[in-house]
A protein has these predicted regions:
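N-terminal leader/auxiliary helical segments
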Residues: 1-97, 102-210
Length: 210
């Protein structure tokens, strides 16, 4: 009985995380209505946003900044520099994987400033999912997306992520802070990724980003 209860609890946690990442993916895709490639491959983008949580490595590797940022940087770099070698479906799926990691970096329980229990971790993420959903569905999310930043180089984009995470770690955070950082940073990184792809002349899917 104990084993079954634990299994169900873990399953419930996965469902909460899955819903949060898909919600964010749909919101980001909605910010690019003119991008026909993205709109045609929304499912691939959403899949990418949950893929890191269903891979075997999830069991042994926490999705926190200091443990996975090198990997995330590599994914961003490959999209910007070698994205022309991917078909549209793969491009958007891998873009979704990047956004998954960025969102996790600005989720309090995924950071060293969080000292709560596993139960508190899971409860926090459940409340975060509900609050994030309310912000998006009520049309409040746009308040947390700053004016689009123009990144001239890949290094500028990576430094943007590093600097915002440094600020994020200045103190213990809460759900309101997380919503602000997740929506703001994910939006800027998503836009910046395709600015750089477009600048490098990578495939049609990078041209209609606005």
């Amino acid at each position: 009985m104990v084993t079954v209860n634990c299994f169900l609890s873990e399953k419930e946690v996965f469902i909460v995380r899955k819903k949060s990442h898909i919600l964010l993916a749909r919101y980001l895709a909605d910010q690019m209505p003119a991008n026909e490639s993205l709109q045609s491959h929304r499912k691939a983008f959403c899949l990418g946003n949950i893929l890191p949580d269903i891979q075997p490595s999830f069991v042994t590797k926490r999705h926190e900044y200091f443990g996975t940022f090198d990997e995330a940087q590599g994914k961003i770099r490959r999209l910007v520099q070698s994205g022309a070698g991917y078909n549209d479906r793969v491009f958007w799926r891998r873009s979704g994987e990047v956004m998954h990691y960025i969102a996790d970096y600005f989720t309090f329980p995924h950071n060293k400033t969080f000292d709560g229990t596993l139960y508190q971790h899971n409860t926090y993420e459940k409340h975060l999912k509900n609050e994030l959903k309310a912000f998006v569905l009520e049309g409040k999310a746009d308040v947390y997306t700053e004016k689009e930043i123009h990144f001239e180089t890949l290094n500028q984009l990576l430094q943007y992520i590093k600097e915002h995470h440094r600020r994020y770690l200045n103190c213990k955070r809460n759900i309101d802070d997380d919503i602000h950082y997740i929506l703001t940073v994910c939006y800027q990184v998503f836009q910046g990724l395709f600015q750089l792809c477009r600048k490098n002349g990578i495939a049609d899917y990078a041209y209609a980003v606005m």
